[in-house]
Amino acid sequence: MVIFLSCNRWEYDNLSEPIEVSLPETYLTLVALDTIYSMTDSSGNIFYAIDEEPDAGYVWDTLHQAFTTITSSRQELHWWGEDSDGEVMGYKYKWSSDSTWTFTNLESGVFYVPIRLDLDIFSFEVRSVDNDGNEDPTPSKLTLPIKNSSPELSFRYLSNPLTDNIGSDTSYTFPTRTFVWDLYDQDGNETITDVFYAMDDTCSGCWSRIDGDETSITLIDISPGIHTFYVKCRDIAGAESMISQFPDSANNLDAQAWVVKPVLGDVLIVDDYPLDNSNNALSWYVGMMDTILGSNEYSYWEIGDELPYSSTDVTANLNYFKTVIWYAAYNNTSSANDTYNRAEASLVNFIMGGGNLFINPIDFEDTTFTWFPLDSLITLNPNGRLYTDKVIESPIDSTLNLSVSHLIAVKVKGFWPDQSEFDSLKEIYHMADPDDSDGWIGNPTVCSMGQYRVTPTQLSGKVVIMTLPLHDGYRPKLQGNGSSIKLFQYLFENEF
């Protein structure tokens, strides 16, 4: 007996009727069953009836599968698909604001709906796609009323001076000041169209506009006196942020007053000694400049612990002047730092642009001075003591010689410049020949002046570095052979 076995591929008898394809189906985890009504008037304005019966005197469009709870533009949606005769391979979704469908193999997404009005209605559709490329002909749909979120603007952290850093409740600047802020809009930062700023007054006509993606502005030629800066932003729907201002009495960590100082003379004294709370060193430099230049013929800048947030302001402050006298701390603690290293780029630009710099760094936190390259460096007093009557000789003229008038109780440096980096180099002071108790050999330099070649036909300004302290915050230190004012008299009469 022969038995024939066969397998019916089609699993039904009538081969003339092909099997019916099962299309995939799509589901959203959120199911909305309400209806929103919309109406457009003759001027093109759209009105909605949400969670209320529409006025029967008008013709309304109906938006089904809607939520009547007003939400924000940030929407997190989840979905899934099923296919009885195959496998769901992905999904296509589209918002009512989109012109095309977008494919994804994910089953969730976070969306920021591009709202352009204070209140608008958006619908979301998603349909599954199976392994044969078939698509759900009836996408799952959701309609959402979305309210515009107001944008936010706040000053960048530390972009305004802290009272702790400047040692005062008043911030003093020269006529250039940069303000920096951060922008945020829940509806997407691209919806922020305008930033407005004002000085001293917030009247309707007092605001100036810049583009909505700007996060800073540099104000120049600010008039001397007390000022307040205001800034706000606006989104495409017309919603505005709260006004941010500096100074702000509600923020007691920041400076509580902003004073713009006039630019006096073409010489700037930079006080980089925050621990000199009594300003004894500054008073000494001021008195010296009164003698050399005359009163009101120079300006001074008390930096405190931190430079301005924007290097643009540092550069601008220096460039107001022809010559800068920058003195650093005699001795720092962990709570205070010199700032000249962080000003390096601005100092280099100043010198290369023709400005003259005298700088007196004592506590060397870094020796890679771009503005004065060093070949080598030694500690003159490893025991931290440089005693009185030690002579500092000038190879230029012995009448310029200085000597230690009060104990220098910090470690100080001698150095040798990297001559290959300079177009010209002049030693102004070196240590006298050592005796048996001294910690140096030979005559290490302690004050030198260099100049760079910027172009084949142009030289830079002159930069002078002095590594012995001229003042310790209590008294001058190099007055044992006459006042050290003679150093500055020489510089201003012969070099600067």
Stretches with model-predicted labels:
Residues Y330-A432, S483:
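A glycine-rich, often tryptophan-bearing local segment used as a flexible ligand/cofactor-contacting loop or short
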Residues F4, N8-P262:
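Low-complexity, disordered linker/stalk regions enriched in Pro/Thr/Ser/Gly
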Residues Y37-M39, E190, L275-A281, D436-D438, ...:
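Short, solvent-exposed loop/turn elements at domain surfaces
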Residues V270-D272, N360, M466:
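Short hydrophobic segments within beta-strands
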Residues P274-L275, N331, F364-D366, P434, ...:
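Short, solvent-exposed loop/turn segments at secondary-structure junctions
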Residues E11, L264, S437-F496:
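Extracellular ligand-binding/catalytic regions of CAZymes and related secreted enzymes
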Residues N277-W371, S376:
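Helical hinge/lid and interdomain linker segments adjacent to catalytic or ligand-binding clefts
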Residues G265-L275:
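Short beta-strand segments enriched in small/hydrophobic residues
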